Amino acid sequence: MINKLSLLLFSMLRYTLFYRRFSIAVSILFLSCCCTRIYSQQLINSSSSDQVRLETTESKIESILSLMTLKEKVSMCHAQSQFSSPGIPRLGIPELWMSDGPHGIRAEINWSNWDYSGWTNDYITAFPALTCLSATFNPDLSNQYGTSIGEEARYRKKDVLLGPGINIYRTPLNGRNFEYMGEDPYLASIMVVPYIKGVQMNGVAACVKHFALNNQELWRGHINVEVSDRALYEIYLPAFYAAVKQGEAWSIMGSYNQFRGQHCSHHKLLLNKILKTDWSFDGVVISDWGGTHSTKEAALNGLDIEMGSPINNETSPRHAYDANFLGTSFLELVKSGEIDERILNDKVRRILRLIMRTTLDSSRPLGKINNIEHSQVARKVATEAVSYTHLRAHE
């Protein structure tokens, strides 16, 4: 009798435990399905929202483009001052303001010369150079760095930050190696992506430079670089590829040097083929300052905005740049039909897209300047770089 009672109790207990476990399992499965469905729906909604936003932006761009005169379109393709390009006031299109540099926002420069303006409120955080950042081997810290410098650029009302620089070290004698992320294409590729995302979350475009093969400063405006396709794709381009495909950079700066006999700021292979076609880059190509040498090549080979000093200083400051390569001479070539207006329209679409992403984005934050958080990021970068370098030296 006792054995039967014990067996009955044991069976009831086992059934209860099984039932509870079964109930819990069913509940977990149900919740999992619900959560998966909710999460999937969130992803769908997010994707749909992004698609709607994209379609709205592109629709606005086409509407604006249809209202612009030929002269207005061309005016957006060149500078109006040392660090800005014009907008179209009658259509509510603002100017684009740019600034150096990769490790600190440059003090204000005069409108039409390279003298400093003497402002007293343009102080910033001086961050360690990008070589130091790269030496931390810390992508999260790279994102903090980019976010901080993006906040300072935004506070100073800059729309395009002229950086980061990711040219690969080819020679230790390059005077700007300190600005770049090292000699390792893989490391530079890993570190540049979070930097770009940090900058651009502030509604400020990262302008990744110098595209491409700008690996020495001596005679940089004239030197003709010759490298094999293998070296080009395996050493000199991977960091730029990561910047475009993973970092989704909004702008790229062409370099001063030539590559296989053609200047890189209007290079058919680098800009039209590799960057805009193979990599599907939808942003703006900006020349290095004074890096443009031909109206036809600039128009046909992928340059969108020509920057630099005015060729003609005799006219009023606001029209001094009309004499530059993508100014009046470009306008005349389009008017004559020698250059198809569709080529001009593609440039203007890209510029308008950049403006939509930056200065016309009403949701972008106001920015911050020279605060304790930025100083802490700068100090952490310097500390981690020195510590890691010291440890590696004693391995």
Task: Report residues per predicted region.
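Bacterial Sec-dependent N-terminal signal peptides
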Residues: 2-44
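Glycoside hydrolase catalytic-domain context in secreted enzymes
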Residues: 41-392
